[in-house]
Amino acid sequence: MAEEIVVEPESLREIEHIVLVLSGKGGVGKSSVTTQLGMALACRGLKVGILDIDLTGPSLPRMVGMEGKSVLQGPRGWIPVDVPTGMEQGCLRVMSLGFLLDDRGDSVVWRGPKKTAMIKQFISDVYWGALDYLLIDTPPGTSDEHISIAEELRGARPDGAIIVSTPQKVAVADVKKEINFCRKVNFKLLGVVENMSGFVCPHCSECTNIFARGGGESLALESGVPFLGTVPIDPAFVEMIESQSSREEPLISLYKTSGLYPIFARIVQHVLDQGIPSRCQ
């Protein structure tokens, strides 16, 4: 039987590193984590892209303040939307189904084959140009969509996956399934981020545990996966996202002054310290 030839999509050939962001269930803040990972990398002067493949809940346009922007069609495919950074070096580009919908309230009611076709098109038909990092925001859970993503990326040799959890036991149980999925499809586990770990008071900035704490860290240790850090709920970050359209200063410039930026700078450093070689070597 002839061996199947796996070809890397041409659209990904100028990208040094590809990282998937996964979660075992919805509502854990995966898209927020993906956005902040992208901004923290861009703050280092790196060229970053974010591909939003969460087809039924495409929230990245709103997260980066680019709602209403249009995706252009170029000779080499769709051209992602550039997010203003206010920096001389680095960039942040975003592609999402949200840019293709007429209204944020439009629902995406598609059967599996149509979702699979859209995932394939997003991976193979978006022209990113040269990037240091491409972050892929995936749907929650494990489904046919995840299998399609894994199949489309086989020839691309992604760096691996970051898994987002919250401290509660029900979320941690779902993360175990995500870890098993990654191992079955040969995605390297770059680490676990425990999101919503505490609440930052908007008045005194004290962080208080409102859920259990340490569930993600314990699971990472138990599973032999790096633990990248804990992220609290910060109302100031939510306010920054919601009010950015009325401000002239670029989102990334605002983000560098937020209390969450140092946390994500450390998380990014933990990933970089793993020393994963460039795909382009």
Swiss-Prot record:
Disulfides per UniProt: none
Cofactor annotation comment: Binds 4 [4Fe-4S] clusters per heterotetramer. Contains two stable clusters in the N-termini of NBP35 and two labile, bridging clusters between subunits of the NBP35-CFD1 heterotetramer.
Top-level taxon of the source organism: Eukaryota
Residues annotated to bind ATP: G24, K25, G26, G27, V28, G29, K30, S31
Subcellular compartments: Cytoplasm
GO BP annotations, alphabetical order: iron-sulfur cluster assembly
InterPro entries, alphabetized: Mrp-like_CS, Mrp/NBP35_ATP-bd, NUBP2/Cfd1_eukaryotes, P-loop_NTPase, YlxH/NBP35
One annotated Gene Ontology cellular component of this protein: cytosol
Record: residues binding [4Fe-4S] cluster: C201, C204
Function description: Component of the cytosolic iron-sulfur (Fe/S) protein assembly (CIA) machinery. Required for maturation of extramitochondrial Fe-S proteins. The NBP35-CFD1 heterotetramer forms a Fe-S scaffold complex, mediating the de novo assembly of an Fe-S cluster and its transfer to target apoproteins. Required for biogenesis and export of both ribosomal subunits, which may reflect a role in assembly of the Fe/S clusters in RLI1, a protein which performs rRNA processing and ribosome export.
Family: Belongs to the Mrp/NBP35 ATP-binding proteins family. NUBP2/CFD1 subfamily.
Protein name: Cytosolic Fe-S cluster assembly factor CFD1
Species, as recorded: Eremothecium gossypii (strain ATCC 10895 / CBS 109.51 / FGSC 9923 / NRRL Y-1056) (Yeast)
Native organism taxonomy: Eukaryota, Fungi, Dikarya, Ascomycota, Saccharomycotina
Gene that encodes it: CFD1
